[in-house]
Structure formats: C-alpha cells, structure tokens
C-alpha cells in the first residue's frame, strides 16, 4: 500500500484550527451554545453546511469560499463537537443534535427558504429537517449520506463486524479511551496526509479521554438498521426517504466520492430521488479534504442555477 504524502499546495493554503475558530461566533441555544461560521453577506440566500461524525465546521473551510460570492454560508459545529457546548443531558443521539439544531435555526434570522449541504450524518439531519419543514427548503446537496435504512448487512458487508464492535463494551473503550473515530478512522478516510496543524484542529475537541468523545461513539450506534437498530431512527429515515423519493420539485445534487467509502452503495439510493444532479470528486469519505475546490465549484454552480430558476 502506498504511503500517504503531504500535499505542498495544501500547506500553502492551510488554515489552522485557531485561525478558523477565530472566524466563528457563538450563540446560546437551549441549555448550551452553538459555535458557527457565518459569512453574513447575501443574506437573502442562505446555504447551511452540516458536518457528520468525527468532524466539525472546520471540514468545510476550503469549500465555502467558492459559495460565499453568491449566498450566505452558515456552518455550525454540532452540539458536543468542534467548539460548540455540551448537551445538557450528556446525550448525543440523532434527535439530541436535531433538537439543538432546530432551536438554533430559529435564532438565525434565516430567509423563508434555505439550501442544505450535508455530509455523512449532517445529511441525515438535513433530510429530516427537510421532511418536517418542506415549505422551508429550496434545495439539498448531499455526500456520503444516510439516504435509506439498511435492510440487510448484505448491503454493507465491509462494516458489519465494525458496527457490532462499536455497540459492545469493547467499543466504548475503543472510542472513549482510544479515540478511534478521530485518530484512526478520520485520517484513514482521507487520501492525502493531513498537515499536523490540520489534524490538530480535528483532534482538539476530543483530546481528553472519556465523555467528551461520546458524540463520536453515539453516531455509529444510530445507523438505521431495520433489524437491531434504533426504531425511532429507522422511522425517521423511512419518513424522509419516502418524502425525497416523491420530491420532484426539490432540486438535489449528490456528490459522489471516487473511489469513496460509502458512495458506491449510497449512489443507488440517491438515484431514487428525482430531480437529482450527479457529480463526482476524488476522495474517500472526507472529500472536502481531497477535492475542496472541485466540490466548492460544483456546489456554487448548483446554487446559482437554483437561484436563477427562482427568478
């Protein structure tokens, strides 16, 4: 296997964690607070970027500059992740994240309709919100996303044992003590080698052992398995999947990662959503780190077309 190497071009354009967080602001939400980036300009057109597991708003740092000339770009750190506060009850299930996210939306002075860009579990949150607030959604972009329930492990043979382990007591140790998702999974799902300062930005929120790492363990335990999964999550995914399959008037874009991690399986589900444009960028799971400019340009072009068609 070829060793990963640093990309000198990425070094030249590098944004460190402290530099990124300095651009962000914080807002009190319920019994905690949300840390977020807000470009503010073009407020009449808002695009909300949502990250997933093991990540933060930092993931989108090289993508959003492409979209900022045409829309207000807003990127939160999900509760308990990045620089956002901890949840009041110490729980980080899908519905906990959704509760804080929707309360935060109410405080943002958003336009009547928004565009979502969701990755990983961030796409799941975007889909769920879109299903529950169909009159507030202008378009959706998604990548490496949770598009449907998992009926059988035949669909995901490579990760069956991993998920069983994550759900066990050994999984608790693997994540809460050894920081599996941030220190092992995240860098393994990026093609290039992250600069030390970049990796430090992902690591910083989860440096301490124990409950601060709970969000990264809770997410994979939410995977919507029909047999053995959480019934409420399975129902949430069934609901938004049915809605998206019938959403002929809702523009969508699916960004496929090549060679990808989940993309090969997800693309078949995404094909069942009408009015979807398909594009492809290089990458494994976190293509924002391997092809940020390509991703940003695709999203900008899509957003521009959506806005033009509204006129």
Curated annotation (Swiss-Prot):
GO terms for biological process: bioluminescence. Substrate binds at residues 162, 285. InterPro entries: AB_hydrolase_1, AB_hydrolase_fold, AB_hydrolase_sf, Epox_hydrolase-like. Residues 45-291 form the AB hydrolase-1 domain. GO terms for molecular function: carboxy-lyase activity; Renilla-luciferin 2-monooxygenase activity. Keywords: Decarboxylase, Luminescence, Lyase, Monooxygenase, Oxidoreductase, Photoprotein. Optimum pH is 7.4. The keyword Heme does not apply. GO terms for cellular component: membrane. SUPFAM superfamilies: alpha/beta-Hydrolases (SSF53474). The keyword Electron transport does not apply. Optimum temperature is 32 degrees Celsius. It is an enzyme of class 1 (oxidoreductase). It catalyses: coelenterazine h + O2 = excited coelenteramide h monoanion + hnu + CO2 + H(+). Upon binding the substrate, the enzyme catalyzes an oxygenation, producing a very short-lived hydroperoxide that cyclizes into a dioxetanone structure, which collapses, releasing a CO(2) molecule. The spontaneous breakdown of the dioxetanone releases the energy (about 50 kcal/mole) that is necessary to generate the excited state of the coelenteramide product, which is the singlet form of the monoanion. In vivo the product undergoes the process of nonradiative energy transfer to an accessory protein, a green fluorescent protein (GFP), which results in green bioluminescence. Monomer. This luciferase produces light with a wavelength of 480 nm. In presence of a green fluorescence protein (GFP) it produces a green fluorescence at 509 nm. This is Coelenterazine h 2-monooxygenase. It comes from Renilla reniformis (Sea pansy). The lineage of its organism: Eukaryota, Metazoa, Cnidaria, Anthozoa, Octocorallia.
């Amino acid at each position: 296997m070829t060793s990963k190497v640093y990309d000198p071009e990425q070094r030249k354009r590098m944004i460190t964690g402290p530099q990124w967080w300095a651009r962000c602001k914080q807002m009190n939400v319920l019994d905690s607070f949300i840390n977020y980036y807000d470009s503010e300009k073009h407020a009449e057109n808002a695009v909300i970027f949502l990250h997933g597991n093991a990540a933060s708003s930092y993931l989108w740092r090289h993508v959003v500059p492409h979209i900022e000339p045409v829309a207000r770009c807003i990127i939160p750190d999900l509760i308990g992740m990045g620089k956002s506060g901890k949840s009041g009850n110490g729980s980080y299930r899908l519905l906990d994240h959704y509760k804080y996210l929707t309360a935060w939306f109410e405080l943002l002075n958003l336009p009547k309709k928004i565009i979502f860009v969701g990755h990983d579990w961030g796409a799941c949150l975007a889909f769920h919100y879109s299903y529950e607030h169909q009159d507030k959604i202008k378009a959706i972009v998604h990548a490496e996303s949770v598009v449907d329930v998992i009926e059988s492990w035949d669909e995901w043979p490579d990760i069956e044992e991993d998920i069983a382990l994550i759900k066990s007591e050994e999984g608790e140790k693997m994540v809460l003590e050894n920081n599996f998702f941030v220190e092992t999974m995240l860098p393994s799902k990026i093609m290039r080698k992250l600069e030390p300062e970049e990796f430090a930005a992902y690591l910083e929120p989860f440096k301490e052992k124990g409950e601060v790492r709970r969000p990264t363990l809770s997410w994979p335990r939410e995977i919507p398995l029909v047999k053995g999964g959480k019934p409420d999550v399975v129902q949430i995914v069934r609901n938004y999947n049915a809605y998206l399959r019938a959403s002929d008037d809702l523009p969508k874009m699916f960004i496929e990662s090549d060679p990808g991690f989940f993309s090969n399986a997800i693309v078949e589900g995404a094909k069942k959503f009408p009015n979807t444009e398909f594009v492809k960028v290089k990458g494994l799971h976190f293509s924002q780190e391997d092809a940020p400019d390509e991703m940003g340009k695709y999203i900008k072009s899509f957003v521009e077309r959506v806005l033009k068609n509204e006129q």
